[in-house]
Amino acid sequence: GDEANVHQAEKCLGQLKELSLRGNEITAQDVNYVLALSMEDQESAIVQLDSDLICNTINGRPVKPKTIGQKKYVDQIRGNMITFGIGPAGTGKTYLAMAMAITAFRSDEVSRIILTRPAIEAGENLGFLPGDLQSKVDPYLRPLYDALYQIMGAESFQKNMEKGLIEVAPLAYMRGRTLDNAYIILDEAQNTTPAQMKMFLTRIGFGSKVIVTGDVTQKDLPMGTKSGLDVALQVLKKVEGISFCELTSKDVVRHPLVQKIVQAYEVYEKHRSEERRVGKECRSRWSP
């Protein structure tokens, strides 16, 4: 074959061999990602990612950043008081945030973990759902529970929750509180209003760290309602101590088909945005 291609293949195989020697089981996803990195002469980054162990799950599986974007996200969390992780489904933004929070909690960097998300999504209103408040909010918080169970184990999670050291609650429960010495994660932040986002960010006390995650393409807010995440991106971009990390379809670590779906929607949204821009220019040009 072509000499350049052969050399590229050798480098990729060398990195995969290094991963294997480190005790990793090489997956098709690893192969595809090393190939993608090699196109940008960054194939050696895969070994650097493998060196960044955040924690282990209850089953002993290591939790590490799997892409360059995820590595950047984890580094920004470590270096800032408030980090916004923005990206599509499957990029690991919430799971990695959970892993970072649990690691900080285990090492006594913080005394508790607080996880929250807006309770109203997909057009549903809690007042019209059957059951008591806990049963109403649980479905909205289930993804957070799932990640905690996987990393901590159900028994450890329940014990810490009973002691008040881990709290999983709707965003409305944050009002009027000051959250000191805590690791706080706001998930699905695209479904907050600007007032809710401001309320949340002003709850932060001394010794706390905050991660805000969201996907600006998946808003469930009523038509015409601004997203608190969009406003925060505009207002807080230059505030020291706050970082914004944008994950993309390149950082999707679920089934390869999910990555293709995300990419297809990115193209669609780009076309829609361009159509709106052109339409706005035309209306402006022809208006009296």
For each feature predicted by the language model, list its residue ranges.
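Positively charged, low-complexity/disordered segments
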Residues: E275, G279-P288
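Interdomain "pre-motor" coupling segment immediately N-terminal to P-loop NTPase/helicase cores
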Residues: G1-D50
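Conserved loop-to-helix interface motifs that mediate assembly, gating, or partner/ligand docking
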Residues: S38-I68
